[in-house]
Regions:
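A glycine-/polar-enriched beta->alpha junction
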Residues: 17-20, 124-131, 152
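General helical structural elements
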Residues: 29, 120, 138-141
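Short, solvent-exposed beta-edge and connector elements
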Residues: 9-11, 15-37, 42-47, 161-167
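Hydrophobic alpha-helix/coiled-coil detector that fires on Leu/Ile/Phe-packed helical surfaces
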Residues: 2-6
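Short amphipathic alpha-helical coiled-coil/interface segments
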Residues: 115-123
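Long, amphipathic, non-transmembrane alpha-helical coiled-coil-like segments
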Residues: 154-157
Length: 167
């Protein structure tokens, strides 16, 4: 092979049409080579892989964190409990008001205030559970982004060719 990239083959002159150097997007040791010299490869074929144990573990960790966040965001236990509490509080307050209407001052003002406070507290618990759900959904979105980033980093450990050709 001549220094200008040409090779002489018994009566024929072969010239390289495209000579490409393909760089890895991450630093590291090559752990796997997917071709042999002289082999034809298609565009976007994976030529080699860099050692990626740490990147793979980051993807697994991010997947677990994402799954956990999705589970938290989809849980409605807190909201259901708050709604049940509100239903009970409203029923108790309504019974006390009915009793006071039927028999004047049968329920003390202090008890009526306590029942109203309990009802208001239950309403606030519903608002709080809704806010918690919104925050949990944002957390799930954040974890999804972290998973995507970890997967992108892992993908950068694969060295692919932009063109078809012979290696």
């Amino acid at each position: 092979m001549a220094t200008d990239g040409t090779v002489t083959v018994k009566g024929a002159l072969v010239t390289v049409l495209q000579d490409r150097n393909i760089a890895a997007r991450e630093t590291g040791l090559i752990s796997k080579v997917h071709f042999k010299a002289g082999e034809f490869i298609d565009a976007s074929s994976v030529l080699a892989e860099l050692e990626a144990t740490q990147a793979r573990l980051k993807v697994e960790e991010a997947q677990i964190q994402y799954n956990k966040a999705v589970e938290a965001a989809s849980s409605d236990l807190e909201s259901r409990a708050a709604r049940k509490s509100l239903d009970v509080s409203k029923a108790e307050l309504a019974r006390a008001q009915a009793a006071n209407k039927q028999f004047s001052k049968s329920i003390s003002q202090t008890e009526m205030d306590r029942l109203r406070l309990t009802t208001e507290r239950a309403e606030l618990l519903i608002e709080q559970s809704e806010q918690t759900t919104r925050l949990a959904k944002l957390e799930a979105d954040l974890r999804r982004n972290q998973l995507d980033f970890a997967q992108h980093t892992l993908d950068r450990h694969r060295i692919s060719t932009p063109i078809s050709g012979m290696v």
